[in-house]
Amino acid sequence: MRNYELMTVFPVEEDLYKPGIDALHSILADFGVQIKSEEPFGDRDLAYEIKKKTKGRYVLFNIEADPAKMIELDKRFKLITQMLTYLFVRLED
């Protein structure tokens, strides 16, 4: 298991944010990912338009995951239509 930071950006509209964050938690649980912390960063302007949105709700996760499952996890994240974008960063052990 390795430690990762996961930065996610969701639409600011509550009816899009809530299902998106629920889908994210469900996928992480399906893959046996342990969420060490979840820190909302709030709503911010995007540097450029993503999926016709100019504002996003940022949430930072510190997670522990199996590196062998990261490619499949990435593929599943792409199916979350409510999530604007995301980034995984592996942390030093």
Curated annotation (Swiss-Prot):
InterPro entries: Ribosomal_bS6 (IPR000529), Ribosomal_bS6_CS (IPR020815), Ribosomal_bS6_sf (IPR035980), Ribosomal_S6_plastid/chlpt (IPR020814), Transl_elong_EF1B/ribsomal_bS6 (IPR014717)
GO biological process: translation
Keyword vocabulary terms for this entry: Ribonucleoprotein, Ribosomal protein, RNA-binding, rRNA-binding
Pfam family membership, one: Ribosomal_S6
One of the record's GO molecular function terms: structural constituent of ribosome
Lineage: superkingdom: Bacteria
Gene3D superfamilies referenced in this protein's UniProt entry, alphabetically: 3.30.70.60
UniProt key word rRNA-binding: yes
Family according to the record: Belongs to the bacterial ribosomal protein bS6 family.
Purpose: Binds together with bS18 to 16S ribosomal RNA.
NCBIfam families: S6
Protein name: Small ribosomal subunit protein bS6
Taxon lineage: Bacteria, Pseudomonadati, Spirochaetota, Spirochaetia, Spirochaetales
Gene: rpsF
